[in-house]
Amino acid sequence: MYRTYRKMKKVFFLFILILLGHLSAGPEETVKEFFQDFINEDILAINKNSDSPFIYIMGKNAVLEEKYSDAINFNGLKRDGWSYSKINTSKVLYDDDDTSMVQVNFSRLDKDNEIILTGDVTYLLVNKDGNWKLKGGFSPNLTTLGND
């Protein structure tokens, strides 16, 4: 009886591991996690949740960097008054097993919770080994990543 119990316990444990592997964040949740990492200025998490190279197209300007963290300058954003960002709306535009596009309307706010910028960005995500990663961002009206 004890042997049967141990076998059942192992099977249950394997089932849980497999289930957890399939419960990774979807594209929209990945973008929300990315925004939280951005607010926390967590460079390691930002790079973990984005793919390399990363491209950002803002109007007619294109930024191609090895890592997303190479494209962003938090000190520059803070000089412009940025304290944090928030997602106003998000919507999955396209989704298959390998790629996804998520449209986001967001605001940047200052320390007094005043909006200093509202923008739209569409993120391209790729599925790498079961994990969604940001590959690129496309924005008609995002003016700066803090590098001006």
Give residue ranges: language-model regions.
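Surface-exposed, charged secondary-structure patches
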Residues: A71-I115
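Sec/Tat signal peptide C-region and signal peptidase I cleavage site
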Residues: H22-A25
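A mature extracytoplasmic/lumenal domain signature
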Residues: S50, K60-N61, V104-R108, V121-Y123, ...
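Short, well-ordered alpha-helical segments enriched in acidic and aromatic residues
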Residues: D42-I57
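Short beta-strand edge/turn micro-motifs at domain boundaries
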Residues: I116-D148
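Positively charged n-region of N-terminal signal peptides that target proteins for export
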Residues: M1-V11
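Sec-dependent N-terminal signal peptides
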Residues: V11-L20
